[in-house]
Amino acid sequence: MVETSQTHRAELEHVPSAADFADAISDDPASAGLLSESEVESLLRGHAAMETVSKEQAQSDVSLLFRTLQSAYGAYEYFGQEKFDAAEDAVTQWLSSQDDEIKVSALGEKLQESLAFMLAHDAHAMIYEPAAEEIEAQVRYEYFFADGFYFSKDVNGSYYMVNDGERWTLSSFSDEHVSVQPTLLQDGRIVYQPTLFALRKDAVQSSVTLKNSSGKAKIYRLDWTESQPLDVDLGTLDYRLIQEDGLTYVSLRSFVSGTYDNMLARYAREGAKARGSKAVIYDLRGNVGGSDSWPRKWIQSFLGTQNSIENSMLYAQKNSALFAAENSESLLPEDEGTCFAREVHGTWYENDIPIIVLVDDHCGSSGEGAVQLLKTLDNVLIVGSNTAGYQLCGNISTFTLPYTGIGVRFGSTLFLYGDGENVDHRGYAPDVWCDPQDALASVLALLKEQGVVSADACETVREKIVQ
C-alpha cells in the first residue's frame, strides 16, 4: 500500500485556492434582498403538485425560482449569473408562446432543459422530480470491464500478456475511453484489465491491438461487462461490526442523522474496537450519505484522538434569508456578507493497520466524503468502482414552488477538492477496480492469499455477513 498512500498524501497537499476561484465564491450584495419574507415562508411551506396553472402563475413561479437560485444556491456564482439569466429568458420566451393554460409537466421539462448546465454538473440539484432520473442517466458515468482479459505489467510500465509462450505487448485501444486499470479478481489476484469508464452512450464495442517483439500485430475484440453495485436497500443503516481473529468488518449504508442517531453514535464509538486489528474491511457500498460528522467521529475513535479529521478543500457557504429561515437563524456572521469562504488544509495521520474500503456507484455525498476522509490515513486502499459523484454542492434543502408545486432541490455550500475538478456524476476512482457486487469476496481472498489474516477468519466473517 506504500504507493497508494503516497498518492493519497499527495492529493491531501492540494488545496483549491480561493484566489483561483474568486468569481465562484464572490460576495453578491444584490442577492440579499431578492426574496421577500412571504416568499421565503411560501418556499418552506410545501405545496401540492398541480396539473395545470395559468400563464401568470407559471411566470410567477419561474421568477421566484431564479431569484431563489441567485439568493441561496451555493454554486450560483460557480456556474455564472449569465447562464442563469439566459435560462430564465429561454423559459420566459417559451411561456409567452404558450396558451393561457400551462401544463406543469411541460413547464418542468422546459426548466430542466434550460438548466441542463446546472443539473448535468451538480448531482444533488433537482428541478421537477418526475424526469430527474432521465437526466441523471444521460450524464452518469458507468464502469465496464473486459471480463477474462488480463495484462501483467513489467518494470518499464508496459502491459503485456503471454500466449503460447510468446509475449504480446499492449499497443493501443480503438476507443479513447478505454484504459488499463489495476483490478482485483475474485481469487484475490490483482491484475491489469481493460476498463471502460464512460457515459452509457459511449459504451460501444472496442478492440485492443497487441504486438510481439517483431512488430507483428493482433487485434482482439473487447466484450464489455457492466459492473453492478451491491444489492441492498438504499437508505437503510445496516450497521455491522464483525470481528474474528484480527479481522474487523464494518458496514454502514447511511449517515443520515435523526432516526438512527443512537446507532450512529454507537458506530462512531466502536471505531475504537478496530484498534489492534490485523486488517479492517470498511464497507461503504450503498452508503447514500447524510452527515459527515459520523465518519469523522469513527476515525477519531479508531485513532484515539480528538484532533480534527479533515480533507483538503475550499468551501463557500451562501448566506441567505432562505438559509437563515430554514435553520432558525443564520449560521454565518453578518459581516461575512452573502458568502462565507474558507480554505481547509487536511492533516495526514499515521496508521499501520491495513484498511480496505469497499465502494460502489451508490456510495455518494457524505458516503463518498467518508472515503475521502479515510484517505487521510496511511495504509488505506479503496476497492470497487467509482463512487456516485455527489460532491459539488452540499447542505441540501428541498422546496416547492407555490403555484405549480414543482419540486426544487439544491445545496447552499460549494465544495471544491484537490485541483478543483468537479466530480459530480463521475465520482472518485478507486485505487483498485473491482466489480462492487464481488468486492467483499475478492478482498477476503486477497487478505487470505497475502497471509494478512487466516483463511478461517475470512470464512467465519463471510458466513456471519451472509446470515
Please give the residue ranges for each predicted region.
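Active-site-proximal beta-strand/loop segments in catalytic clefts of secreted hydrolases
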Residues: 251-255, 283-287, 312-319, 358-362, ...
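Extended C-terminal subregions enriched in glycine
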Residues: 354-376, 381-389
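BRCT (BRCA1 C-terminal) domain core and associated BRCT-interaction motifs
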Residues: 377, 382-432, 439-440
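Loop/turn elements at helix/coil->beta-strand transitions in domains of secreted/extracellular proteins
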Residues: 245-247, 275-280, 351-355, 377-381
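Flexible, low-complexity junctional segments that flank or bridge functional domains
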Residues: 1-280, 286-288, 297, 395-398, ...
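Glycine- and acidic-residue-enriched helix-capping/beta->alpha junction motif
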Residues: 267-268, 272-340, 375
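Extracytoplasmic/secreted cell-surface and envelope-processing proteins
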Residues: 259-260, 289-298, 364-370, 391-394, ...
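Low-complexity, Gly/Ser/Thr/Pro-rich intrinsically disordered linker/tail segments
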Residues: 421-467
